[in-house]
């Protein structure tokens, strides 16, 4: 055995040991700790006692009812708006289709805590729209938007990204010749939509509806920012219980929510697979846009489409404009009367406003670098070798995608709130590093999924040719494999970096005064009455939107598209 081969084996086993330790310490142990906290107390089964305490709590019962009806209402309103968007973009001929497509795609760059803060700035007590309405209706309360209505409104217009991406793709698989055949037989437009188009796209509609339901049920940022004092959902109660030092009740509530969400995820995957099978290769004639012959219907559809476009674009435009406005104009002016770079100078100038931006940039960079290193080491092994170890790693890497973020966060808190021998008897809770560790775990599923596809797509002849010329394993990886997967790695790194900048649920559970990230600063600014803090928050939101747009443009350039995550609304 040559020296290089021995070194390869040493690095191989050393890397596997490190990854196995990381998976055990920061994924499996926290999950077991969360289960133990939910089910046991002082060594005995206490789940039923915790359930009884939760059931007796009026706030928990109210949050449960709010979650149930808000989830149902959101699913209904998002389905109506989303299907209308798809019909306007992919079925009917409406003027300005390109502009409407841009407007309807804004949830891809304007989601989660960024969008919740943006809607609060637009329609909240200090919002520009509220200022305009107050001038017209002086008796209008400044907090008219805060409460269940604001949450439902935000959900409705921020959760249509699944329809925009998946349902539009399903519409393109409809065979236009079947529509023409039905039309030639005298079928009306509504009959064609109901009897020809809908059966083809129905599995995708069901999958998208379930994804919307999952997102609405786990909504966190929207009720936190827009719900006010009287409207709370279960995700907020988990955070509240944890802050009250009741990790047992927090873990149990997160576990119950997780079980429901996992069941819905399995259902959505079933319908997604059925949709892919049903509409697989049927479309021989691409669907053509249909003109709306009835003049009144054409006017109504066009007006509704542009009204939706205005609703989507208004918060984005106002945020960008007011991020360049003096802080004194926020909450007073409908549109800024002057512009300044002072807000950006405060954020980027190295003062107190720069700290959350720096913290998020640093922690996101660390998380992406560590996650990418783990992925680039583990995925080639998982692709080449199929044994119990690689299958186990594969399952572990998918777990953070299935397990709700709140349950993962509670598990990390419970596992590391005391000296833990797996990390040298350190107490990580309250330290700088627990949040970056959570970011790494949160990032792994998407990284593994995309990089696996990239490695599977490599022609084995390249590696075999390098091996035949005597190249060692590390040399082949560095000079042959990595250049081939580099575009995907760059895209995935950019996507996760952008997601982590706006990751609110995990940050809300794990941050401390030493590493306060951007999402927490954005929420603080959104609910603050201080115009200076609100102005800084607008700069944060604008910078995150700029990063999101840059990632999408890179994705377009690399022709790899973009896959959406839970908006964590």
Swiss-Prot record:
UniProt cross-references to CDD domains, sorted A to Z: TM_PBP2
Keywords: Cell inner membrane, Cell membrane, Membrane, Plasmid, Repeat, Transmembrane, Transmembrane helix, Transport
Listed InterPro entries: MetI-like (IPR000515), MetI-like_sf (IPR035906)
Pfam families in the cross-refs: BPD_transp_1
Compartments it resides in: Cell inner membrane
Reported function: Probably part of the binding-protein-dependent transport system y4fNOP. Probably responsible for the translocation of the substrate across the membrane.
Similarity comment text for this entry: Belongs to the binding-protein-dependent transport system permease family. CysTW subfamily.
Protein name: Probable ABC transporter permease protein y4fN
Source organism (scientific name): Sinorhizobium fredii (strain NBRC 101917 / NGR234)
